[in-house]
Amino acid sequence: MIAEIKKSAEQKMQKSLEALKLDLGKIRTGRAHTGLLDHVTVDYYGNPTAINQVANISLADARTITVAPWEKKMLGAIEKAIRNSDLGLNPTTVGELIRVPMPPLTEERRRDLTKVVKHEGEAARVAMRNIRRDANAHLKDLLKEKKIAEDEERKGQEDIQKLTDRYIADIDKLLQAKEAELMAV
């Protein structure tokens, strides 16, 4: 029973960590990366579709993303979708390609993005602590129902605390890396 609770808590913590990685990946830095356009959708035959489902996305250089639509008629729609996204990008069409240059970040924008990163990190830490709280509550319920002994409950709580500490350390590493990436000029 205790092993199941720990396994469940670890799976939930892993999902929270993956969600944080996705959220941090959407925050634009000065460098181009293809994952930046993953959440941008375009209208494709009446259905909102991710750009990477209707075009090849690649890097031309460190500061430029190129988008090559599989259908020429999608050029305008994809360019418009990128321009209207909340990324602050200004794509241009060159022949059958869409070039998306990464504008350099201003110092003020870097600070704002750093605040966003810290906020996302704190939300992930809170999620980890909530998972810990739920697991500990489940252990207490088992103790009340006399399905486990006090020693087993205490050991389970210690294990869950170690798990929580490990995942929070992982969050801190992710945040430090993202902040360093943002502040690099």
Swiss-Prot record:
HAMAP family: RRF (MF_00040). The keyword Cell division does not apply. NCBIfam families: frr (TIGR00496). InterPro entries: Ribosome_recyc_fac (IPR002661), Ribosome_recyc_fac_dom (IPR023584), RRF_sf (IPR036191). Coiled coil: none annotated. The keyword Cytoplasm applies. It comes from the Bacteria. Responsible for the release of ribosomes from messenger RNA at the termination of protein biosynthesis. May increase the efficiency of translation by recycling ribosomes from one round of translation to another. GO terms for biological process: cytoplasmic translational termination. Pfam families: RRF. It is found in: Cytoplasm. Belongs to the RRF family. The gene is frr. Gene3D superfamilies: 3.30.1360.40, Ribosome-recycling factor (1.10.132.20). One of its GO terms (cellular component) is cytosol. Keywords: Cytoplasm, Protein biosynthesis. One of its GO terms (molecular function) is ribosomal large subunit binding. This is Ribosome-recycling factor.
